[in-house]
From Swiss-Prot:
Its EC number is 2.4.1.255. The gene is SPY. This is Probable UDP-N-acetylglucosamine--peptide N-acetylglucosaminyltransferase SPINDLY. GO terms for molecular function: protein O-acetylglucosaminyltransferase activity. It holds the Pfam family Glyco_transf_41. It is an enzyme of class 2 (transferase).
């Protein structure tokens, strides 16, 4: 257990949120009950999760809770259980006879039954609350329908239409119907005014324009018949075409959507909504220069369009122009101060910059502005993660998942965060991954057969998929040394912005006869189809649950054999992945850590490191000139747990005059620095002996920063990988510790492979002993530093050709098993399907055979656009969805740091709100 005394919350960061170690007051850990449960149920309803919301309402113990009865009724109503819904609304009315919401919903049920007279409940609702808009809208609809039903009685019908317009002056169908009646009565002037009013209230009301044209034609006014009010018609064409474009885009035809937007501008060249949506579409198509042009035009013609400013900020953020992004977000907020997306996005930028206090302030404001803003809680989790508070990070991710259980970002961030504190004492982390994988797999259809010839010795097609920057140090060897005659490489690169290294990799792959495909921004199901077309035999994903992963691609199971490797220290949890590549030190044969995948051990280390050409020379050990030992770590703050700090403090206290240097991005924030230092002071280490460095952007400068330390201290239970390799290559020996899980043992594998197994500790006391012992002989430390790079370069860790020979033998062994029908994932999926079938059959067997009397019909109402659909109470008002919203495809950017899991953000729905994957 981690001692509560040293779980320090950063000063100035998100006041009022408690550490998860104090579960008593935790908003996430506390069970849902009372008002909180009802609030959560309303959130679920707002996200159309009516079944889940109903389950919460069913648990409400207070039989006099009117809001619970109404909420339950609404959920039942959406499931076409009208009789049960009516009982709920009736009970609410019994408890509160003047409840406008309950009365309105009773009216809706009567109307859906065709009992328009009884639907006078709307009138009662208005009498109870004249300002209750849903009742007015629904009553207008009923009166309009009554007027139509009285077609044989013209005057009574007209009266009903006028009553509808009086109740809701903006109700266009009643105006239109008045026009029809007056046309039949040959009162064409009155009819024209009615049609014009209908068109004014609903500019896309085609029938109103058509009937207007007919009247003008019958009068002989052919010019007006062809173009009644030409300017209005052009504007309305622009509106209609823009809406049509958005409809096409949302249905998957983005090119047709763009064509409609452009056509809309032909009719109305200054229509800002069309420009705005063109900007959105071009952003989705990754044509960012065009997106910028149309977003700027949209803002020029509509200076109140905060959404356009926000979207510009998203693009500039993706292009690493953070100052310009901040300017755009601030401009959006000057227009809409409570614009939750821009508040959130500004918090994202500040988090990337390490300005944790400013980031916290913005994200908190976003949540205040929109309490159901799920991704803001996800970003809050990333903020806590970066600040080193994993417990609060996990709480924030879980809060996001409470609001949006399908949030992929929060779900995967939560799994990753749990690795930082998992010591392998139980199976909870495995179960969390397994459960996630089972749910995630159901979102995709799986391929279960392949055309790949089952010839055990034929040349194989090997597919690699990854977006990550740090992985380049470990993926270069396969791309360079594979035998392309027998192992043709296809690379699926999801890199956001190709740099010089990416271009070099591409050239090498293509020169050797391989295939390079850029898949950034392409739907994962389409990528899976590409993999099928490429006839990939073995597909290897390299990121697991880290940033911008393509596990959706793996969930489709496009290749006969699927493998996970390198980028994630645990199981993916996906039943569609056959194998996980590791070694006997990272995952011993007797490991108790469970995996969904079958473990395949390479004969040496499971990693092959290619040093950076920008590393520069090894510098002399600084203790020679300083006169004291400097310990250090460049791992991210999330890995430096309270227990790690306890051990480090013991080392520093045991080595007189020694110093500690730690480098990570959040140290540019004063509150994070002070929290870190105060924690060490509580452990007996003076803050004057600690140097904290913020992120160093340039790789050369980052590598040269190792010249400041004599001995590198590894983290646990999540050890370093890239940082350990960098440290060793720069001549800095590293102390690591053996553990029970893969994440803990990566350093064991790296050091043992290089020949430094004697620096692997068995436990915390041994860790302290080894560090103190190594620091006691500066001469030996200096000699080791001068020879360590050569020792590492000649070790199996950097022997690319030999590593690839072993890897190719492993691939061939997998293929032999496949040719014999041995497919681990298919066997696993068959077991899962059988288990699910058994559960369903058991549920059907236990389900009572009841058939309650129905009050309303099961069929949906004919007019799905009518205001009576989707009713809600005052606390849950009817929501009009703006169809011209921001709807971008996932895109991401990785922080240029040496940390293994770089920060990234994704543009999501709703005006480009950015969200972190870590």
């Amino acid at each position: 257990m981690i001692e509560k005394a040293i779980v320090a919350k950063p000063k100035g960061l998100l006041k009022g949120v408690q550490s998860s170690s104090d579960s008593k007051g935790s908003p996430v850990k506390k069970s849902l009950e009372g008002k909180e449960a009802i609030t959560y149920a309303k959130i679920l309803r707002s996200r159309n999760k009516f079944v889940d919301a109903l389950a919460i309402y069913e648990l409400e113990k207070d039989s006099k809770n009117v809001e619970a009865h109404i909420g339950k009724g609404i959920c039942l109503q959406t499931q076409n259980k009208g009789n049960l819904a009516f009982d709920c609304f009736s009970e609410a009315i019994r408890l509160d006879p003047h409840n406008a919401c309950a009365l309105t919903h009773c009216g809706i049920l009567y109307k859906d039954e065709g009992r328009l007279v009884e639907a006078a409940s709307y009138q009662k609702a208005l009498q109870a609350d004249p300002s209750y808009k849903p009742a007015a809208e629904c009553l207008a609809t009923v009166l309009n329908d009554l007027g139509t039903s009285l077609k044989g009685n013209t005057q009574e019908g007209i009266q009903k239409y006028y009553e509808a317009v009086k109740i809701d002056p903006h109700y266009a169908p009643a105006c239109y119907n008045l026009g029809v009646v007056y046309s039949e009565m040959m009162q064409y002037d009155v009819a024209l005014s009615c049609y014009e009013r209908a068109a004014t209230e609903s500019p896309t009301y085609a029938d109103a324009y058509c009937n207007t044209g007919i009247i003008y034609k019958n009068r002989g006014d052919l010019c007006l018949a062809v173009s009644p009010n030409f300017e209005i018609a052009k504007n309305n064409m622009g509106i209609a075409l823009t809406d049509l474009g958005t409809k096409e885009k949302l249905e998957g035809d983005i090119d047709q959507g763009v064509a409609y937007y452009k056509k809309a501008l032909y009719y109305n060249w200054h229509y800002s909504d069309a420009m705005y949506n063109l900007g959105v579409a071009y952003g989705e198509m990754l044509k960012f220069d065009m997106a910028i042009i149309f977003d700027e035009l949209a803002f020029h013609f509509n200076p109140h369009c905060a959404e356009a400013c926000n979207n510009l900020g998203v693009i500039y953020k993706d292009r690493d122009n953070l100052d310009k992004a901040v300017e755009c977000y601030q401009k959006a907020l000057s227009i809409k101060p409570n614009f939750s997306q821009s508040l959130n996005n500004l918090g994202v930028v500040f988090t990337v910059q390490g300005k944790m206090d400013a980031a916290a302030s913005m994200i908190e404001k976003a949540i205040v502005a929109n309490p159901t803003y799920a991704e803001a809680y996800n970003n809050l989790g990333v903020l806590y993660r970066d600040a080193g508070n994993i417990f609060l990070a996990i709480e924030a991710y879980e809060q996001c998942l409470k609001i949006d259980p399908d949030s992929r970002n929060a779900g995967q961030n939560r799994l990753l965060a749990m690795n930082y504190i998992n010591e392998g004492a139980d199976d909870r982390l495995y179960e969390a991954h397994r459960d996630w994988g089972g749910r995630f797999m159901r979102l995709y259809s799986q391929y279960t057969s392949w055309d790949n010839p089952k010839d055990p010795e034929r040349p194989l097609v090997i597919g690699y998929g990854s977006p990550d920057h740090f992985l380049s140090y470990f993926i270069e060897a396969p791309l360079l040394y594979h035998d392309y005659e027998n192992f043709k490489v296809v690379t699926y690169s999801a890199v956001v912005k190709a740099d010089a290294k990416t271009n070099r990799f591409r050239e090498r792959v293509l020169k050797k006869g391989g295939i390079w495909r850029d898949i950034y921004g392409i739907d994962e199901k389409k990528v899976a189809s590409m993999i099928r077309e490429d006839k990939v035999d073995i597909l290897i994903e390299l990121t697991g649950h880290t940033a911008n992963n393509k596990l959706g691609m793996m969930a489709c199971r496009p290749a006969p054999i699927q493998v996970t490797w390198i980028g994630y220290p645990n199981t993916t949890g996906l039943p569609t992945i056959d194998y996980r590549i590791t070694d006997s030190l990272a995952d011993p044969l007797d490991t108790k850590q469970k995996h969904v995948e079958e473990l395949i051990q390479l004969p040496a280390c499971f990693l092959c490191y290619t040093p950076s050409p920008e590393a520069g020379p090894v510098s002399p050990t600084p203790a020679l000139s300083n006169g004291f030992i400097t310990f250090g770590s460049f791992n991210n703050l999330a890995k430096i747990t309270p227990k790690v700090l306890q051990v480090w403090a013991r080392i520093l206290c045991a080595v007189s005059n020694s110093r500690l240097i730690v480098k990570c991005k959040p140290f540019c924030c004063e509150s994070v620095r002070q929290t870190f230092l105060s924690t060490l002071e509580q452990l007996g280490l003076e803050s004057t002996r600690v140097d904290l460095l913020p992120l160093i952007l340039l790789n050369h400068d980052h590598m040269q920063a190792y010249s400041l330390m004599d001995i590198s201290l590894d983290t646990f239970p999540y050890a370093g990988t890239t940082t350990t390799c960098e440290s060793l290559y720069m001549g800095v020996p590293c102390i690591t510790m053996r553990g029970l899980v893969h994440a803990h043992n990566v350093g064991v594998s790296l050091l043992s492979t290089v020949g430094l197994g004697h620096l692997v500790a068995k436990n915390e006391d041994d860790y302290v002993r080894l560090a103190v012992q190594l620091a006691s002989d500066v001469t030996a430390l200096s000699n080791l530093r001068l020879t360590l790079r050569e020792l590492m370069s000649k070790s199996p860790l950097c022997d690319g050709p030999k590593f690839i020979q072993d890897l190719e033998l492993t691939y061939r062994s997998m293929w032999h098993r496949y040719c014999k029908g041995d497919i681990p994932s298919l066997s696993r999926m068959e077991i899962l399907q059988k288990e699910e079938l058994d559960v369903v059959q058991e549920q059907l067997h236990q389900q009572p055979n009841t058939s309650p009397q129905k009050l309303v019909k099961d069929e949906p109402a004919d007019d799905a656009s009518g205001p009576e659909h989707g009713p809600a109470s005052k606390d849950n008002p009817l929501v009009l969805i703006k169809i011209n919203g921001y709807n971008t495809s996932p895109s991401s950017i990785t922080s240029p740091s040496s940390e293994e899991n770089g920060v990234s953000q994704t543009r999501m729905l709703n005006c480009g709100d950015q969200c972190f994957r870590v």
